[in-house]
Amino acid sequence: TTSERGHLLWAAACRRYDLIAEFAEEVLRERFLLMTPALDHSHFDSFLRNKALWHDEVAALKESTVAKLRSNVFRMLIEAGLLSENGNIIPAVLSDRVSEMLSARSPSDIRFFPTARGGR
C-alpha cells in the first residue's frame, strides 16, 4: 500500500543516514511518546546544535546546507505520513508485515517511528 511504501522509505532513509535516524529517534519518537504532538523547524535546529557540540562535521555545515537538509527531512516526514502539513506528528500505524520487517533488525527499526510499539 501507499502507507507501507512511505513507512519503508522512511526506514530506508534512517538506515542510510545516521543523522536522520538520530533525529527520528531522539526528537520525532520522543516528542510523540511524551505526547507533545508539534514538530517544527526549531526542533530540528536545536537537534543540530546539540549534535554540533560533538561532531565537527555538523558544526561545519553552511546555513544553506542546514536549510536544505531541514526542508528535505520535513518533506520526507510528510510524504511518509508521519507529519501533517501544519507540523503535527501523525502516529504511525504500521501494518503487520511492515512491523515484522522493521522488527527483524536489532535494534528494531520501529524506533524511527512515532508509535508506542517497542523500538529497542
Q: Which residue stretches match the model-derived regions?
A:
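Hydrophobic, aromatic-lined core segments that form the binding pocket/scaffold
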Residues: 2-7
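Positively charged, polyanion-binding regions of nucleic-acid-associated proteins
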Residues: 9-11, 15-38
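Short, amphipathic alpha-helical segments
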Residues: 14, 18, 38-42, 63-71
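Contiguous, well-ordered alpha-helical segments that form the cores/surfaces of helical PPI scaffolds
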Residues: 22-26, 46, 75
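Amphipathic alpha-helical interaction surfaces
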Residues: 26, 30, 34, 50-54, ...
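Short acidic alpha-helical/loop segments enriched in Asp/Glu that coordinate divalent cations
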Residues: 33-41, 57-61, 88
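DNA-recognition alpha helix
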Residues: 40-56
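Accessory, usually C-terminal, subdomains that scaffold auxiliary metal cofactors
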Residues: 59-120
